[in-house]
Amino acid sequence: TITPQPQSGNSKPRVFRLSDDKAIINSLGFNNKGIKKVKKNLIKHQKSYLNNKIVGVNIGKNKNSSEAIDDYLIGLEELGDLASYITINISSPNTEGLRDLQLRGKIEKLIKKIIDKRDEIKNINTKPILIKISPDLNEDQLRDIALISLANNIDGLILTNSTIKRETNLISMNKGKKGGLSGRPLYNNSNIILKKMYELTNGQIPLIGV
């Protein structure tokens, strides 16, 4: 996930393998080189990677940003014309306060501004916008996101990011580490979210299971 300014992410160690559970816990925290560097790299390799290839760009907010929406708008403006699609990552558990952007009032405001900005920029007004959501949302929250996505013609939903929940049957030594859990323990719940969201959107929005 790319943020406007470069940031180092959370302190190391921040990736833990749970081999016995076929899982990983990460607390990376959007470590990246920032939009300027990424844009430069994309332009440099534009001819080679755009040759019949799909290039997705995930955008997020900086850890210390006071204006989250502005960070996403900057990402869209700067990288939109270099991507095949843009993913709005509002579901990582490793940036404090980020997942609050999934709450009804906040996500509605964010999505409207993102769509308005995309539609007004000639080079990116046809680029698909996808939203990546958490597996830890309750049914009311999923319903809100479904309705808001339908109302604003969101092009797709990515289901799901990693979870902060821990199954009681985890047996690996690193099971208590802080961060987002992904892998086999998340498989069933992620598929449940996928099924629920298909029902809530009446199959009208493409869903990507990860």
Features from the language model and the residues they span:
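Conserved, mostly hydrophobic/aromatic
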Residues: V38, V57, I88-N89, K132, ...
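A gly/proline- and charged-residue-enriched helix-loop-helix capping module
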Residues: T3-N51
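Active-site beta-loop-alpha junctions enriched in small/polar residues
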Residues: I2-T3, G60-N64, S91-P93, K132-D136, ...
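Glycine/Thr-rich beta-alpha phosphate-binding loop at enzyme active sites
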Residues: P93-K106, L142, I148-I205
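Non-cysteine beta-strand/loop elements that form the S-adenosyl-L-methionine
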Residues: T1-N10, G80-S91, D155-T163
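Short beta-strand/loop segments at the ligand-binding rim of alpha/beta enzyme cores
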Residues: L50-I59, E120-L137, E199-G209
